[in-house]
């Protein structure tokens, strides 16, 4: 062999063998919990001791929430004279109250409610609108928005159509994009509520003062991060079709909505999981709502009868767990009760007829060692 020849080293044959480490070979030390009466029974009693009182506390807290609901779906059929609201349209929760009276009338597109607050409602006081039979949780509905547009980007029609979620409400017949586009924005709840005027009686015409309620701060802080002021100018965009009442002459440089500060819009865009839901409309966090007769004017815009739905105005206080929620307290109490009852039953069974259950000495691979 010449010196110029290159000596080739033999290649080592590679084997597809896994690493011999304990982790790869699954031979790490392990411990498995063995269920015996002496481990299960304390756990059941502990769960019962924790969950049952917790559920009872939640139930009691919900009982202390003061709440008034008035279904005003049929208000526009009443006429311009005050008439009594049917008792079936009123729901309430007050400690020592068995009856609450309310009156209503309509004029034009305004529904006027005059109702009784029988007990003081301590601040904060919240006003919610409640819709029934409205399915915001439909997938086609919940995804019908362009998040880049809501974050302030001036999206073109081509970009909206390529994204596809706003279909069929990306643009009008002239090719101008809707702002904001999509079904969920187009169906924005647009009833508006006034603050409360206090009166001496249902027949009185002289108000005693104003109980101010505001929309400021009603949206969640994390929702505000999802919206920015738009970079569109008024000539580039048009309002969604169902916003014609709010913007009869379209957008101008002075009236383009700033969705980053529009709490009602942000609240509506957070889709509800169930067909019956409540969303915050107004609040007062500083002043208690004193007992008396109050009046609220509601601009009646949002249709509900077409899909056999209803709409309700609801006034409520809060508790340590939020608003009224009996289900959560009952659920915790039932789980705690079942755990405690199971513990008692198993304890009696073990005392009356004990069995060699869960004892590791009686496992097949341990029997030889014990003998």
From Swiss-Prot:
Top-level taxon of origin: Eukaryota
Any GO BP annotation: phospholipid translocation
- Phenotype on disruption: Abolishes invasive growth during nitrogen starvation.
Subcellular location(s) of the protein: Endoplasmic reticulum membrane
The disulfides recorded in the entry are 75-111, 166-181
**Which residues lie toward the Extracellular compartment?**
61-325
Q: Name one GO cellular component term.
A: endoplasmic reticulum
State if Disulfide bond is listed as a keyword. yes
- Transmembrane ranges, per UniProt, are 40-60, 326-346
Summarizing the function annotation, the protein's role is:
Accessory component of a P4-ATPase flippase complex which catalyzes the hydrolysis of ATP coupled to the transport of aminophospholipids from the lumenal to the cytosolic leaflet of membranes and ensures the maintenance of asymmetric distribution of phospholipids.
> PANTHER family given for it?
CELL CYCLE CONTROL PROTEIN 50, PHOSPHOLIPID-TRANSPORTING ATPASE ACCESSORY SUBUNIT IVN1
Assigned protein family: Belongs to the CDC50/LEM3 family.
Q: What is this protein called?
A: Phospholipid-transporting ATPase accessory subunit ivn1
Q: State the species of origin.
A: Schizosaccharomyces pombe (strain 972 / ATCC 24843) (Fission yeast)
